[in-house]
């Protein structure tokens, strides 16, 4: 593709050099650059891409996109100066890969909790209908049934457009994608055309990056502000920010709720550990999910599928066949008659939702033992809140290590313990070794009790000092169960 074709989607401040050259690849990582490539320099959170411009030129880059021009310009290289490289990178990548999102029905899901579940269940629903479908999520990316490992909730613009291009080339009609607040703030989705967007909820998370809840809200809201006129926005009325998200959107707004009058209205009729009986828009359905938060997630899936042209009755049949997403309220029965639940809940609100769901089924007939930690090098403010919420809704609490990253596990545990009063501490243990913490919970549990192992869900590693060590909560539980049969 000619460089001048790529530049039609952006507004350069200045161009130095030949625009008629052929570009054979686009990169934001100088290590990936080959002869004939366009290297795009961005100010990253860890490193500044501008520092790698000489290395990119050395490796054969024939064009450089940047915010600040180098002092010395290399001969035979075209330099494109832009005001906002993050925005330009997304748009340039979209153009280079042939605007793949315009060939797909791309639906984005954003919010603090529920993104993975909703995106994955939409993917499964539309595969049930017989379509080739793409999924971009925290757990894994899929091109129909081909699994592609994932690094981030939302990939960088080049990886993302390359992936969407493959999805379009391989015949996918629909793509369901988690849209993180980081990806919106960093404009990783710049240039993409969305057919629809779904808002789940907004609670405290990622304040290590956004600094304030207001900034976090603005990042989420921008996704809907930028939605095109012919798209839909489906928002959760049960969240106080639901209508705030869509107040400036050009898209058609629809609502879903378990509490209020809305376009897609739901309620929980019955709840058991085997599943729930629900009512969606005056239709009853039985599902293999537990908890009001999952009823809300399924209602969002129901609404989005209908807005994408499916009949309500057909969607209800599809929903009744679905299974919970890996690491999301993942229940395992022990030989001793207690239940262990592995869940990704890593925010105070998500933890409350899961614990409320457990109590809704138990109805006071068993104890709740919660094993929980908090991630290192992340929002420290939520640590004492996580511990407090666990203690409020549990009979016993074991504070343990999660992904400590570059912090000391005991320091994180101490931050969590600071949220507990004297009464809370009487029912709380602190065990830094996560495996030992889970084993202790199993020793404390009796028939009819529930153990919640929260925070990691689908993850099969512990991030310690920059190294990912294999660790899987569900594997650990199964191993303990097999030893105690």
Curated annotation (Swiss-Prot):
Binding site residues for meso-2,6-diaminopimelate: 378, 402-405, 455, 459
SUPFAM superfamilies: MurD-like peptide ligases, catalytic domain, MurD-like peptide ligases, peptide-binding domain, MurE/MurF N-terminal domain
Post-translational modification as stated in the protein's UniProt record: Carboxylation is probably crucial for Mg(2+) binding and, consequently, for the gamma-phosphate positioning of ATP.
Binding-site residues, ATP: 111-117
Catalytic activity: UDP-N-acetyl-alpha-D-muramoyl-L-alanyl-D-glutamate + meso-2,6-diaminopimelate + ATP = UDP-N-acetyl-alpha-D-muramoyl-L-alanyl-gamma-D-glutamyl-meso-2,6-diaminopimelate + ADP + phosphate + H(+)
Annotated positions binding UDP-N-acetyl-alpha-D-muramoyl-L-alanyl-D-glutamate: 30, 153-154, 180, 186, 188
Subcellular location(s) per record: Cytoplasm
One Pfam family matching this protein: Mur_ligase_C
Pathway(s) served: Cell wall biogenesis; peptidoglycan biosynthesis
Motif (Meso-diaminopimelate recognition motif): 402-405
GO CC, alphabetical: cytoplasm
Main location: cytoplasm
The UniProt record lists the keyword Repressor: no
Cofactor entry: Mg(2+)
Biological process (GO), any one: peptidoglycan biosynthetic process
EC number(s) reported in the record: 6.3.2.13
Keywords assigned by UniProt, alphabetized: ATP-binding, Cell cycle, Cell division, Cell shape, Cell wall biogenesis/degradation, Cytoplasm, Ligase, Magnesium, Nucleotide-binding, Peptidoglycan synthesis
Modified-residue entries (N6-carboxylysine), positions: 220
Family matches, as Gene3D superfamilies: Mur ligase, C-terminal domain, Mur-like, catalytic domain, MurE/MurF, N-terminal domain
Alphabetized GO MF terms: ATP binding; magnesium ion binding; UDP-N-acetylmuramoylalanyl-D-glutamate-2,6-diaminopimelate ligase activity
Similarity field: Belongs to the MurCDEF family. MurE subfamily.
Main function: Catalyzes the addition of meso-diaminopimelic acid to the nucleotide precursor UDP-N-acetylmuramoyl-L-alanyl-D-glutamate (UMAG) in the biosynthesis of bacterial cell-wall peptidoglycan.
Name of the featured protein: UDP-N-acetylmuramoyl-L-alanyl-D-glutamate--2,6-diaminopimelate ligase
Organism of origin: Bacteroides fragilis (strain YCH46)
Lineage, top ranks: Bacteria, Pseudomonadati, Bacteroidota, Bacteroidia, Bacteroidales
Gene: murE
């Amino acid at each position: 593709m000619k460089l001048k074709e790529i530049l039609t989607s952006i507004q350069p401040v200045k161009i130095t050099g030949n625009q008629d050259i052929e570009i054979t690849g686009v990169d934001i990582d100088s290590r990936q650059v080959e002869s004939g490539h366009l290297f795009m320099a961005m100010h990253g959170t860890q490193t500044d891409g501008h520092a790698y411009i000489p290395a990119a030129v050395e490796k054969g880059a024939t064009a450089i996109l940047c915010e600040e021009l180098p002092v010395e310009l290399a001969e035979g290289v075209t330099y494109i100066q832009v005001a906002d490289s993050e925005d330009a990178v997304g748009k340039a990548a979209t153009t280079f890969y042939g605007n793949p999102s315009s060939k797909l029905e791309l639906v984005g899901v954003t919010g603090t909790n529920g993104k993975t579940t909703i995106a994955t269940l939409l993917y499964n629903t539309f595969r049930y209908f017989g379509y080739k479908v793409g999924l971009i999520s925290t757990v894994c990316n899929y091109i129909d049934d081909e699994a592609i490992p994932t690094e981030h909730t939302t990939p960088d613009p080049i990886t993302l457009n390359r992936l969407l291009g493959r999805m379009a080339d391989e015949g996918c009609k629909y793509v369901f994608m988690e849209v993180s607040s980081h990806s919106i703030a960093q404009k990783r989705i710049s240039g993409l055309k969305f057919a629809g967007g779904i808002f789940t909820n907004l609670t405290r998370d990622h304040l290590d990056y956004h600094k304030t809840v207001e900034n976090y809200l603005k990042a989420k809201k921008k996704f809907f502000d930028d939605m095109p006129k012919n798209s839909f926005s489906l928002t959760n009325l049960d969240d106080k920010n639901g209508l705030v998200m869509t107040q400036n959107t050009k898209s058609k707004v629809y609502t879903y709720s378990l509490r209020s009058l809305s376009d897609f209205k739901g309620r929980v009729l019955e709840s058991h550990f085997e599943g729930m009986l629900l009512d969606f828009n005056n239709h009853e359905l039985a599902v293999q999910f537990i908890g009001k938060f999952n009823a809300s997630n399924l209602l969002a899936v129901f609404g989005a599928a209908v807005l994408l042209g499916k009949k309500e009755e057909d969607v209800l049949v599809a929903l009744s066949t679905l299974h919970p997403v890996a690491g999301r309220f993942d229940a395992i029965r022990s030989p001793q008659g207690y239940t262990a639940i592995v869940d990704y809940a890593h925010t105070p609100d998500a933890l409350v939702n899961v614990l409320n769901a457990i109590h809704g089924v138990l109805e006071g007939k068993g104890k709740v033992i919660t094993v929980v930690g908090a991630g290192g090098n992340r929002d420290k403010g939520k640590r004492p809140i996580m511990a407090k919420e666990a203690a409020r809704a549990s009979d016993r609490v074991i504070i343990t290590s999660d992904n400590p990253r570059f912090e000391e596990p005991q320091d994180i545990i101490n931050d969590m313990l600071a949220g507990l009063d004297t009464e809370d501490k009487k029912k709380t243990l602190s065990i830094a070794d996560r495996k030992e913490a889970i084993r202790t919970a199993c020793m404390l549990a009796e028939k009819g009790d529930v153990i919640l192992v929260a925070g990691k869900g689908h993850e099969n590693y512990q991030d310690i000092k920059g190294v990912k060590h294999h660790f899987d909560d569900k594997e650990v539980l199964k191993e303990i169960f097999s030893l105690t049969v």
